[in-house]
Amino acid sequence: MGKSEKEVATHGVRCFSKIKAFLLALTCAYVSKSLSGTYMNSMLTQIERQFGIPTSVVGLINGSFEIGNLLLIIFVSYFGTKLHRPIMIGVGCAVMGLGCFLISIPHFLMGRYEYETTILPTSNLSSNSFVCTENRTQTLKPTQDPTECVKEMKSLMWIYVLVGNIIRGMGETPIMPLGISYIEDFAKSENSPLYIGILETGMTIGPLIGLLLGSSCANIYVDTGSVNTDDLTITPTDTRWVGAWWIGFLVCAGVNILTSIPFFFFPKTLLKEGLQDNGDGTENAKEEKHREKIKEENRGITKDFFLFMKSLSCNPIYMIFILISVIQVNAFINSFTFMPKYLEQQYGKSTAEIVFLMGLYMLPPICLGYLIGGLIMKKFKITVKKAAYIGFWLSLTEYLLSFVSYIMTCDNFPVAGLTTSYEGVQHPLYVENNVLADCNTKCSCLTNTWDPVCGDNGLSYMSACLAGCEKSVGTGTNMVFQNCSCIQSSGNASAVLGLCDKGPECANKLQYFLIISIIGCFIFSLGAIPGYMVLLRCMKSEEKSLGVGLHTFCMRILGGIPAPIYFGALIDRTCLHWGTLKCGEPGACRMYDINSFRRIYLGLPAALRGASFLPALFILILMRKFQFPGDIDSSDTDPAEMKLTAKESKCTNVHRSPTMQNDGERKTKL
């Protein structure tokens, strides 16, 4: 019985001593971290409405993840390789769970969400409520009561979200650089592209789950369980609606903590893949030799750091690759972060529907592209130079295809006084004093409260009062306003709650946009793995962990942090009507000028991506001077060593420590 238990224990240890088991655990970590990140992005609009903050602040919250990552990335990427990498990854996953939990805290500390409305609670219960009354007292004006303004300070609770996202970023830091370097160190070189493709596939499965979770939570009212939803006068398509964003963060917290557990059972080092089948004597000898090498590495931590930094900074392909990545990250982060907001405004759909469509249409082709790209690299043993050309041409093809989305657009919502006149004539610019017209000047209406209604003439109005409606019947979302003096139609001049629908033609354009996105996502992801292998193979083996970390560091500080902030500020400039808080301060934007929004959302990323192809061309030219390991017999070559020209060799002629020389003896092939 004792022998049987010993065999089981030995089998358990062996299971955690294989690179494929680590790959499975790391893939789960990739799923959990991308699940959390995607869910966060899908809920940014809900957070914006919950706290009544502008898009620029939302961009700061989104960029705070990168700030947390930035605080540790260089330290973790270099010093982490000298420590226990699997345990550090496990700790990182647990910290991500803590950050997600902290993000959800404001919901439990704040009161109920109150959306702006012109409908008094009594009028919602009455079948004969007059909303347009001459010389009435405007009881719905923003309050000047100091106690109410103190309550309004609850909007500062978004700082919890900011800090939680920073902590989430700190926890995510060790997963990619340490996980990638661990696989690169102990996997066969020809299997490495496939393994990375599997990891990237995990990074698309996570977003798929995250978007589906976001879609479900966005359909649930934020205060579900504590309010009677039948009394609500808004629906998920309304820009004042706030979904139960906090539920998903609790789910993400639990998933991240569960994902962290397996990493605490993996050893610090593994045998190189393919050596496990050797005899016990050979296996033990190699393991002992590897342990001695690790001890030597730990003696020269800080000394090697500066040597590696100098070597990487003198690597032209590596430095240009960083430049390309920074430019493209600025483009892609902007596009992905604000895609739900753009599609909501462009096509008039709810957050829940948009997020669901993003997950359904865009993520499966990305997942398929990553997987096929990794399989192609493994099957055909594509050299680094060929991989660079494949990545370049596929990226360029997808970039040119993206311009088709410029014609898949819709017009602004027809809102009287904002985008059109009360006669239905479109306005080129927003003029605030046009909100009032002859048909509603005697109604004593509030001009800054957003409570839109749709008239049976096809025009929307900022409120039932501004539509000149004198009477309402029904309750909740079924309320109908009648006797509306501003609505000129052959019917009974009535209106219902909410903006008018943009029509079937606009809905068809959304489908065309999604089809183009499917093709574009597949093409781009197909070339992502070849492109990433260029980054990994242009560095020496001992530099890979630091190189990947430095690459991530530059993308975070020059792209991930500033991009959402300046992009959000530009989007704010396209706002036509801001929500109003209790103390009269502007809240979240209720409606954007979609034409200006479109030019910023599509135009700026297109310009940035276009600029990135110039240094990419320079890399293709520069690579002619290099001999990559995939182009020659790898059995006699350092895995990431490159033959440089005489001039370039001077830059990398640094004094190597014995540790670096020993690491350089490791043999791999592409």
Curated annotation (Swiss-Prot):
Coiled-coil ranges from the UniProt annotation: none
Residue numbers bearing the Phosphoserine modification: S634, S635
Keywords: Cell membrane, Disulfide bond, Glycoprotein, Ion transport, Membrane, Phosphoprotein, Transmembrane, Transmembrane helix, Transport
Compartments, as annotated in UniProt: Cell membrane
Extracellular compartment residues: 41-59, 112-155, 225-242, 334-353, 406-513, 572-605
InterPro entries linked: Kazal_dom, Kazal_dom_sf, MFS_dom, MFS_trans_sf, OATP
Function: Mediates the Na(+)-independent transport of organic anions such as taurocholate, cholate, 17-beta-glucuronosyl estradiol, prostaglandin E2, estrone 3-sulfate, L-thyroxine (T4), the cardiac glycosides ouabain and digoxin and thyroid hormones. Shows a pH-sensitive substrate specificity which may be ascribed to the protonation state of the binding site and leads to a stimulation of substrate transport in an acidic microenvironment. Hydrogencarbonate/HCO3(-) acts as the probable counteranion that exchanges for organic anions.
Protein source organism: Mus musculus (Mouse)
Keyword Chaperone: no
One cellular component (GO) term of this entry: membrane
Biased composition (Polar residues): 651-662
Tissue: Highly expressed in brain and liver. Detected at very low levels in heart and lung.
Protein name (Swiss-Prot/TrEMBL): Solute carrier organic anion transporter family member 1A4
GO biological process: cellular response to xenobiotic stimulus; monoatomic anion transport; response to estrogen; sodium-independent organic anion transport
Membrane topology: Multi-pass membrane protein
Name of the gene encoding the protein in the UniProt record: Slco1a4
Transmembrane segments: 21-40, 60-80, 87-111, 156-184, 204-224, 243-267, 312-333, 354-377, 382-405, 514-536, 546-571, 606-623
